[in-house]
């Protein structure tokens, strides 16, 4: 993170992006577990792609309706993989997960939009501000909502926390948001659900967790098909914009 080479207005906006995409998002996300089972939370996260494409279009002051079609196919693929019986008393939890989805989608879209708008490419100099915003929100949430008397992690739990903070979150979010700036917004939206089969494969290979392979293959195929469809949709819009 650098100070002199970064536009102060951009730095402040990236702080706000981090505060929303990680900070506020995780408040909604973890709170939802008080109302939903794990598989229900996982199921309701599949709607994030809709938020990504709609919010990015809103920031760009445009509306590419066909993007919703390819994104819907990706959502269907994720639904095939993750569908399970739903608890009848899930409305509060559902809304909390959608709040998390909205924050995560807004963060990705805003980050991509801001870097395009400012023409800033040296993301390593900027991304620290993302975590400044995220840390500010999570620190306040921990003070207000946390119970530090119960925080007594074992060595293995501490190691997991360090890994989650340095690798999964720090490196992971940097690479994800950097990638978001390299691809079309529809591809970014679809890839949010491509994480689902990837996570299941990791659990299957490394931790031998049970998985419905038929659903995994069918859902993954639909997500792949959504990418093929989206590539054709991108070409359609490119040709139309050239004519205009």
Enumerate the language-model features and the residues they cover.
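Transmembrane alpha-helical segments that form core, pore/gating elements
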Residues: 1, 52-53, 86-146, 244
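C-terminal transmembrane-helix exit sites in multi-pass transporters
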Residues: 1, 29, 48-69, 197-216
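Membrane-interface helix-cap regions at the ends of transmembrane helices
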Residues: 1-8, 21, 54, 74-89, ...
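Specific transmembrane alpha-helical segments of multi-pass solute transporters/efflux pumps
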Residues: 2-39, 80, 166-183
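Cytoplasmic-side transmembrane-helix entry/capping segments in multi-pass membrane proteins
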Residues: 10-16, 63-74, 94, 121-129
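Hydrophobic/small/kink-forming positions within alpha-helical transmembrane segments
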Residues: 18-23, 27, 49-54, 105, ...
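Hydrophobic transmembrane alpha-helices of multi-pass small-molecule transport proteins
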Residues: 63-83, 193-194, 213-234
């Amino acid at each position: 993170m650098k100070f002199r080479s970064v536009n102060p207005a951009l730095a402040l906006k990236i702080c706000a992006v981090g505060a929303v995409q990680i900070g506020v998002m995780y408040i909604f996300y973890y709170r939802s577990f008080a109302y939903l089972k794990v598989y229900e939370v996982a199921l309701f996260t599949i709607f994030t792609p809709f938020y990504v494409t709609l919010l990015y279009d809103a920031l760009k002051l445009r509306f590419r309706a066909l993007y919703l079609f390819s994104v819907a196919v990706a959502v269907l693929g994720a639904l095939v993989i993750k569908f399970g019986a739903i608890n009848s008393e899930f409305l509060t939890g559902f809304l909390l997960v959608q709040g998390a989805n909205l924050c995560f989608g807004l963060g990705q879209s805003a980050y991509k939009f801001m870097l395009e708008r400012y023409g800033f490419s040296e993301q390593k100099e900027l991304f620290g501000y993302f975590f400044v915003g995220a840390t500010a929100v999570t620190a306040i949430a921990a003070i207000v909502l946390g119970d530090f008397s119960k925080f007594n992690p074992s060595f293995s739990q501490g190691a997991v926390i360090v890994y989650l903070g340095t690798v999964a979150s720090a490196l992971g979010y940097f690479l994800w948001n950097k990638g978001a700036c390299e691809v079309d917004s529809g591809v970014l939206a679809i890839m949010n659900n491509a994480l689902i089969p990837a996570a299941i494969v990791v659990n299957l290979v490394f931790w031998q967790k049970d998985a419905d392979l038929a659903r995994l293959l069918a859902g993954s195929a639909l997500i792949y098909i959504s990418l093929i469809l989206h590539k054709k949709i991108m070409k359609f819009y490119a040709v139309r914009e050239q004519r205009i």
